[in-house]
């Protein structure tokens, strides 16, 4: 690999993306993170609207479908929070999205209930259960700062509902595959009264047992080895809507990565690589990596002919560099990446991690395809899984450098004969 690196390094122009490239990506981020695309979720078909937009984007760049279509459809089970969620504590209404969140596995409920507040160590679930043992809480909400994940998945108190008091209002959809028998609501500690006596709540849900969503895939054929493939991937889905009035833009996570693979697709459509490049915008990453898992089980090109898969997720910052998941377990590929960066100083630093099932590289790697997941690092932008992850605040600090690094890595990957 070292000989290949130095052979090809002399042929590369040491430049990152152009300002026009970053502007192109920012336009895509602005579109995908706009309210028109509904947070790219499943209530009001935001994910489907986004898939159609990306198909058009790939086509306009001159890419071709794999087989007869750009779409690879599959089904997921998902619960959606619809209508207008409402929450009032001691009679004072809280603002949805910024002061409270409704867990994605919550059922329809409406009414006013008394509240039992349990003050105990945040992770000590056994103490909470001991305090409530033998009590009839069927018409009572439990309010607690306990952070045990079980509270979002099981009705351990046999209560009417649970209010989780938290400093960080992060929303997730990975628990939306089924519906609990009670609602779970996250409320901001600063928005909640010191003593909660009553809760008035209104939640509506709609459960989809088999919602059809789609991966979006497009190809640039290789000039010398068209039957060898490199995958460039990012998930385009996000959290969607919590009712009619609140949506989660998802600019950093992951309109940013989606925009870069669209930008790379445009570049390689005009400058084809020796091997074929497959660009895949995955759906249903936020629900549990379901889109990439489906692809790994139903690949559009042979996995044994896939040389590498590079996944981009959360790349809107970068003041301190990037981190590479699987960098520790694929040292030769990581050495290639760092050698390219040392030559061109594309990003400030490249950190590495081991295996992690935290993005769409995972199931490809587990099915035998060498794979990296790259994300940017830096404190200049920290919005995550909330209503403030918007396009207008996204700095794209390391965008140009990361573009150049990924482009060169694709061109320098060794091609087995």
Question: What does each model-found stretch correspond to?
Answer:
Residues 273, 282-382:
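Metal-dependent peptidase/peptidase-like ectodomains
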Residues 266, 381-417:
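His/Asp/Glu-rich mid-to-C-terminal helical/loop segments that flank catalytic regions of hydrolases
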Residues 107-113, 168-249, 266, 270, ...:
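Soluble metallo-hydrolase cores and metallopeptidase-like ectodomains found primarily
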Residues 17-65, 220-222, 226-227:
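N-terminal hydrophobic or amphipathic helices/low-complexity stretches enriched
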Residues 13-15:
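N-terminal signal peptide c-region/cleavage motif recognized by signal peptidases
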Residues 35-45, 60, 72-75, 117-119, ...:
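Second-shell loop/turn segments in exported
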Residues 38-145:
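Noncatalytic luminal/extracellular "stalk/propeptide" segments of secretory-pathway proteins
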Residues 32, 58, 74, 78-82, ...:
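Acidic/His- and Gly-rich active-site-bordering loop/insert found
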């Amino acid at each position: 690999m070292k000989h290949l690196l130095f052979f090809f390094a002399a042929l590369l122009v040491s430049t990152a993306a152009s300002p026009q490239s970053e502007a192109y990506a920012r336009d895509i981020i602005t579109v995908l993170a706009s309210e028109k695309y509904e947070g790219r979720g499943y209530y009001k078909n935001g994910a489907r609207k986004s898939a159609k937009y990306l198909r058009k984007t790939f086509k306009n760049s001159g890419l071709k479908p794999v087989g007869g279509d750009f779409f690879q459809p599959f089904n997921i089970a998902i619960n959606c929070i619809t209508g207008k969620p409402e929450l009032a504590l001691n009679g004072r209404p809280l603002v949805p999205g910024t002061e409270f969140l409704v867990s994605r596995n919550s059922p329809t409920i409406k009414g006013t209930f008394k509240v039992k507040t349990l003050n105990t160590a945040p992770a000590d679930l056994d103490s909470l259960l001991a305090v409530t043992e033998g009590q009839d809480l069927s018409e009572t909400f439990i309010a607690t700062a306990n952070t045990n994940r079980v509270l979002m998945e099981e009705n351990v108190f046999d209560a009417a509902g649970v209010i989780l008091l938290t400093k960080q209002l992060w929303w997730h959809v990975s628990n939306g595959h089924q519906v609990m028998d009670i609602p779970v609501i996250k409320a901001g500690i600063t928005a909640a009264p010191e003593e909660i006596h009553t809760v008035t709540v209104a939640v509506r849900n709609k459960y989809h047992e088999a919602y059809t969503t789609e991966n979006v895939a497009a190809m640039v054929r290789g000039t010398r080895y068209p039957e060898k493939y490199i995958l460039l991937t990012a998930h385009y889905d996000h959290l969607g809507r919590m009712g009619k009035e609140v949506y989660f833009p998802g600019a950093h996570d992951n309109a940013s990565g989606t925009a870069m693979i669209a930008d790379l697709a445009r570049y390689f459509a005009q400058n084809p690589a020796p091997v074929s490049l497959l660009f895949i915008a995955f759906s249903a990453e936020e629900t549990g990596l379901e889109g990439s898992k489906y692809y790994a089980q139903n690949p559009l090109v042979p996995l044994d002919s896939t040389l590498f898969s590079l996944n981009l997720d959360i790349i809107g910052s970068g003041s301190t560099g990037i981190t590479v998941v699987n960098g520790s377990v694929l040292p030769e590929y990581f050495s290639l990446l760092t050698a390219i960066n040392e030559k061109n100083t594309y990003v400030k630093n490249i950190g590495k991690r081991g295996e992690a099932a935290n993005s769409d590289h995972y199931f490809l790697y587990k099915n035998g395809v060498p794979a990296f997941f790259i994300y940017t690092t830096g404190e200049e932008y920290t919005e995550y899984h909330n209503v403030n992850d918007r396009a207008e605040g996204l700095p794209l600090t390391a965008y140009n450098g990361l573009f150049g690094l990924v482009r060169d890595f694709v061109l320098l990957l060794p091609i087995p004969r």
